[in-house]
Amino acid sequence: MKFYISATGIKKVTISNPGVGIGKGSGGCAAAAAALAARRFSSRTLLLLLLLLAIVLPFIFVRFAFLVLESASVCDSPLDCMGLRLFRGGDTSLKIGEELTRALVEETTDHQDVNGRGTKGSLESFDDLVKEMTLKRRDIRAFASVTKKMLLQMERKVQSAKHHELVYWHLASHGIPKSLHCLSLRLTEEYSVNAMARMRLPPPESVSRLTDPSFHHIVLLTDNVLAASVVISSTVQNAVNPEKFVFHIVTDKKTYTPMHAWFAINSASSPVVEVKGLHQYDWPQEVNFKVREMLDIHRLIWRRHYQNLKDSDFSFVEGTHEQSLQALNPSCLALLNHLRIYIPKLFPDLNKIVLLDDDVVVQSDLSSLWETDLNGKVVGAVVDSWCGDNCCPGRKYKDYFNFSHPLISSNLVQEDCAWLSGMNVFDLKAWRQTNITEAYSTWLRLSVRSGLQLWQPGALPPTLLAFKGLTQSLEPSWHVAGLGSRSVKSPQEILKSASVLHFSGPAKPWLEISNPEVRSLWYRYVNSSDIFVRKCKIMN
């Protein structure tokens, strides 16, 4: 090996290695160079490998740590998680979903309080859930348990809110609007100061029509002045021969004065109208006793129904909310609603009538009803609805009666449809030849003996029993009911073609809770030009 060193003043200095032979100089240098290159290559590779490991190992450690933490609730073991991540290249979202589903299904719901209205230890909001999971570092099973309790509590709150909203909606239907109260007061005052409001109804020249069988007699039992005016106005406006109609209004003593004043003042635009108060009837003592007994029994049934609902904290079986709450309406106890069973005694000189409720509006001529052949039956009524034969949602016999009692199950069929009240044709001559009124009283007494458990409160259930087998079915287009419900299910074409629209249900058209989609069908027959209607702001 030789080193050549150059310096100032020295041209060349040569240092020779004595251990290297002259003959081997070129071969020895090549071997030494190869060994030096091999040492340099191995050192560089080792340095790069160490640098790579220094970068990769921390990531592997962190990833493995996460897998170990997840394995407690997701994977069967850390190696399982590593197998999922490293060898399959996927994530654990599918297995997490399966584990979460299993935890939710297996989680018991034994967290209700003694009343079943709450969940112990349940959280109130999503933020509370996040804090709970973050601070306490819960596993997936704990997360499922807490989440399920929270959701159950929220579901109960929603159901409770819906239930209370339904109860309040029904309570709103019990009141009398300020505008109607105003109308009655102003008409009562008008009756006392205006001689025209006190004139005889009908006028003397028309009295003979009250019992003339050649005229079409319509009966209303009502204490609502505005509703009665709409019924008569809509009937007259849609009649081909309005002069053929005679209206008989029966009201209570309280409403007689404003009712008489309204039709006396508006007599020019009305056909023959008779207004009669219950205090003007002179019935035998026997009839008075039966009427009083009838009302007493209906009150007992109503009170028992109310007490049962109160004891159950006004909870309901699904699908029975409407019937249960509507049965609590004070109108179920109103005398005028129960007097229809005594119509033959109210009108002893009439043979055929049409009875209309005060919550109906007439859209076509009713004259052909008096020509309808009842085939020897007493009452003509719509049985099947527009939706088809034996289609009557919410008014099958099972919706009114307690079929667990043998008295009911032996006389009626659960799935049969009850006929609609509100627009009925009565053959009073045929009625007088039956014992319908007495059968009605008999069923009331049987109800008392059976513990008042035979039917829901109201006049219709015992009426259905008394008229069993004496009903003639009419075409469904004559009468469409249910417009006083929360949602009107009848199609628009059915509503337009119906002869009589019945706002049966709590949402009467004169109430604010009425359905705006059908309210206009009733309000178009309100006399908006009348001074009392304007002063009382009824159209507003």
From Swiss-Prot:
Transmembrane segments: 48-68
Topological domain spans for side Cytoplasmic: 1-47
Tissue: Expressed in roots, inflorescences, siliques, leaves and stems.
Keywords of this entry: Cell wall biogenesis/degradation, Glycoprotein, Glycosyltransferase, Golgi apparatus, Membrane, Signal-anchor, Transferase, Transmembrane, Transmembrane helix
Glycosylation, residue list: N402, N435, N527
Lumenal-side positions: 69-540
SUPFAM superfamilies noted in UniProt: Nucleotide-diphospho-sugar transferases
Pfam families, A to Z: Glyco_transf_8
Molecular function terms, GO-annotated: polygalacturonate 4-alpha-galacturonosyltransferase activity
EC number(s) per entry: 2.4.1.-
Phenotype on disruption: No changes in the cell wall content.
Biological pathway: Glycan metabolism; pectin biosynthesis
Primary subcellular site in the record, as a coarse category: Golgi
Keyword match Coiled coil: no
Assigned GO CC terms: Golgi membrane
Domain of life: Eukaryota
GO terms, biological process: cell wall organization; pectin biosynthetic process
Membrane topology term: Single-pass type II membrane protein
Keyword Isomerase: no
Major enzyme class: transferase
Compartment(s) of residence: Golgi apparatus membrane
Family classification: Belongs to the glycosyltransferase 8 family.
PANTHER family registered for this protein in UniProt: GALACTURONOSYLTRANSFERASE 15-RELATED, GALACTURONOSYLTRANSFERASE 4-RELATED
Role noted for this protein: May be involved in pectin and/or xylans biosynthesis in cell walls.
Stated name of the protein: Probable galacturonosyltransferase 15
Organism: Arabidopsis thaliana (Mouse-ear cress)
Gene: GAUT15
